[in-house]
Amino acid sequence: MSQIIWGAYAQRNTEDHPPAYAPGYKTSVLRSPKNALISIAETLSEVTAPHFSADKFGPKDNDLILNYAKDGLPIGERVIVHGYVRDQFGRPVKNALVEVWQANASGRYRHPNDQYIGAMDPNFGGCGRMLTDDNGYYVFRTIKPGPYPWRNRINEWRPAHIHFSLIADGWAQRLISQFYFEGDTLIDSCPILKTIPSEQQRRALIALEDKSNFIEADSRCYRFDITLRGRRATYFENDLT
């Protein structure tokens, strides 16, 4: 019983979640809602579908080092990221779709609107996907993204990060966020992270170095666990209610 009380569903806690309007994060000035939000009822198809099948995934979908390589390997530090997706009671969330996208080692995205002077890597696409197994486990291999400047304030840089999306039982439950890497000196000065008032919530978005799973002369490893719902939930950008 104590576990259920501790991990009970929680409405938005303003002490943990950032306000929609946060002037320090300049983009929120235009993007934050000006009117009261309207709740739309979910239909049965939205809360019960889709169900993903492993046979629809390619063998390289979760290998960002190889899934876009053309005439060589991408440049940069090779890393493995892995972890578990669990619900508020610690139970595994199996067959959840995890999607990731990121900048390359130079801090540049493969997107026509990204005009940063960082070099484009012809062998790196920067996106991947995978399903969690019966234990809620996921893993992918990639190149550690580089930091990049952004037009928030004068000379501000985003710390290295990877965006991720998670879909479990239905499209209406799609959750989106981004995680960072332990030891990055830009984390503490990031205006986006600063909008989250809870230190615990900020730290929950940092992937921890996992030296026990380093691959000798190949890759470093980071672990990032995701908790859905409840007071121990991972902070998601699009789930503020």
Curated annotation (Swiss-Prot):
MF (Gene Ontology): ferric iron binding; protocatechuate 3,4-dioxygenase activity
Pathway: Aromatic compound metabolism; beta-ketoadipate pathway; 3-carboxy-cis,cis-muconate from 3,4-dihydroxybenzoate: step 1/1
Keywords: Aromatic hydrocarbons catabolism, Dioxygenase, Iron, Metal-binding, Oxidoreductase
A Pfam family the protein falls into: PCDO_beta_N
Top-level taxon in the UniProt lineage: Bacteria
Enzyme class: oxidoreductase
The protein's name: Protocatechuate 3,4-dioxygenase beta chain
Organism of provenance: Acinetobacter baylyi (strain ATCC 33305 / BD413 / ADP1)
